[in-house]
Amino acid sequence: MLPTGEGAEGQDWHLDMQLPSKVVLSAAALLLVTAAYKLYKSRPAPVGQAGRNNKDHKAENETEALGQLAFQEAPPGTLPRGRRRRKASKGAGTSLDYSLVDPEDPCILDISRSEEATRKGSDESQGRQCPDSQQVPPPCGGQEAGTDVRGKPNPPHLPHSGCEPTSSSGRLIPGVGGSCVGDKLSPWPDSRPPEETGSGDLEAPNGWTDLTLVNGDMNQSWIFTHMTGVSRGEAGVLQAAADMGLATQQQEGATNASHTFSSVARIRMEENIIQKAEGPGLKGRVYDYFVESTSKADSRPVPCPAALADAPSPGPGPEPLVTGAASRDEAANTAGGGASEAASPQPVASPSAPGFSRKVSLLQIAENPELQLQPEGFRMPLPAHLDQRAQLSSACSHGEPHVQLVAGTNFFHIPLTPASALDVRLDLGNCYEMLTLAKRQGLETLKEAAYKVLSDNYLQVLRSPDIYGGLSGAERELILQRRFRGHKRLVVADMCPQDDSGRLCCYDNVQDAWHPLAQLPPEAMSRGCALCTLFNYLFVVSGCQEPGGQPSNRVFCYNPLTAIWSEVCPLNQARPHCRLVALEGHLYAIGGECLNTVERYDPRLDRWTFAPPLPNDTFALAHTATVCANEIFVTGGSLRYLLLRFSTQEQRWWAGPTGGSKDRTAEMVAVNGFLYRFDLNRSLGISVYRCSASTRLWYECATYRLPYPDAFQCAVVDDHIYCVGRRRMLCFLADHISPRFVSKELKGFPSARGTLLPAVLTLPVPDVPQTPV
């Protein structure tokens, strides 16, 4: 029955509208089938199917691209990357085989297509790879190892000169005993990373091989076995490196020796494919493992300094000191063309310090502080037998302590006995060791000699934490007091910057005579310099250097016990015409030309720092300063009507008026708790005013009638105040009851050419030998 009318017309319209829908539906179905087919082909097959479809793999798989890795020299810690190859089979159940192949690598691991063949090859390799313990290492003794995990041979961790790769490709090239020898070596005893040692598909072919020393050298070579039984379901990279160093200390002609063994192992494993990752992108992981160990073995003490020699065997097994592990996850974007490719993460820096080279392991141990052993571990105790003068004369006949380098530390091995103690020359390098031995063995003569060396070079000892920190409080006070054994003398420096010459002379009050002491260094010659003594050292602060009159901030030091000039830390500011005083083991440089600042010197740190400045922005020029009752007093010059006082406890200045006359103040000194101020008057001469540091009440105590008196500077020796001028020298007796000038005029400084600067030093007895260092 035919439709008629409006019903037939509506049905024709419905048939006409279904045709475009069918086309769209067919196209969508075709795209869906294509996408499902591609997804099915790119799906990684289970591990068990790899062995069953081995023949189909060989017949149907075609290589699209070879990922190759060129083992070139690269900085330590970097991981060269190569193109990754994905081999896919058209058949069902095929597995993906990701690999990195180096066509120029002489040591390439070819993984078999089935687990059974892999395990069989592992057994055969294990049977072949049982080398003797005395196996000779190859000429290119690489300590860097690269092995294949899940189908990838990894590059060496560190480049090594002299081990260039050769151009070859193919299967594993057998070396010694069927193992791969060269730069590509397996770093673990069981040829697998620590996190996979328990996996069922991995087997350990062999352990470490022994270290062999050839011709007594320290060069070593390592032979590692390759890995078998790699899982086919994942792709990864294992990178390993192992370094070792052996320092041997052995007495020549004897069996006693000391061994220092250090080793470093680094493992990096990359998991580039994680099948259970969520999202369209694939993830990768990097595991870094670092193990460092060091150990030592000391034999019986030997009487003479041990000589550095090579030994054929290392010390005992290493003790792990530092271990670390790090992991990292990264997301990789999918590549075009429908093939998913895992983005390889960049190498992570190893947490360890730089390792040491295998060629010069001993030198690298000396350069790496983390591999060095403390000196206490190598200190030899004193021999029990005393008849060793012959041994000392034979081994240490040169008279100097023998110095040798073991793991970067200097050791002094001196067989010291009561009979041979006087034959050893002491200096700063061995005096503390000898002092320790002398106290242990009860050698009083040696102990006194060591104390003398420490005392004569007190500043160097003070700046050495190893020496000064090992002394007790009583010993520190003892070596300081020993510096003041001798005669306290007046010392005057004749500064003549015009002639670039100067001298240091001392005054003998018994004979009323002057004696030359030392020559001033040309660098210390300046106009407006200042002198002061601290710890029986003479410090000179430079003023203005000639020619040109440029201000200088240099500071020099003279040791009267060793007759040696040295330069210490310079000032922060140049201070011509400043005043220099010593208080509580520090130096204070006060004022200077247009300066109101103060600097303090710490001899233990050898450093100048700023102290509280002068109050009220008062600058001090042509002034004088002294120390009394643990306080600093400043007056005179631009401070004509002021007396400034500084307290170290409160770290502040006080300003007060001065008492007495309005005359010019030439000098101010302190004796026995009293301040003595010397004022000059053109008609009356010299007036002396005294003030107690506690009451601060000034009064005139003595005068010296002298028309037109010359300027002078003062220095205190016991209770005598010496007023040193160019034409004459006066002596003032600072008696508590009756202070007065000595009637006898003393002999003046002979042939003064420049400015005379007095100071006080304790000079040693001429017959006592000194120890210049």
Curated annotation (Swiss-Prot):
Membrane topology value: Single-pass membrane protein
Alphabetized UniProt keyword annotations: Glycoprotein, Kelch repeat, Membrane, Phosphoprotein, Repeat, Transmembrane, Transmembrane helix
Main location: membrane
Xref: SMART domains: Kelch (SM00612)
InterPro entries: Kelch-typ_b-propeller, Kelch/BTB_domain_protein, Kelch_1
Gene Ontology, cellular component aspect: membrane
Renumbered residue ranges of the record's region Disordered: 64-99, 114-207, 296-355
Modified-residue entries (Phosphoserine), positions: S89, S361
Any Pfam family hit: Kelch_1
Keyword RNA-binding found: no
Subcellular location: Membrane
Residue stretches spanning the membrane: 23-40
This protein's name: Kelch domain-containing protein 7A
Organism: Mus musculus
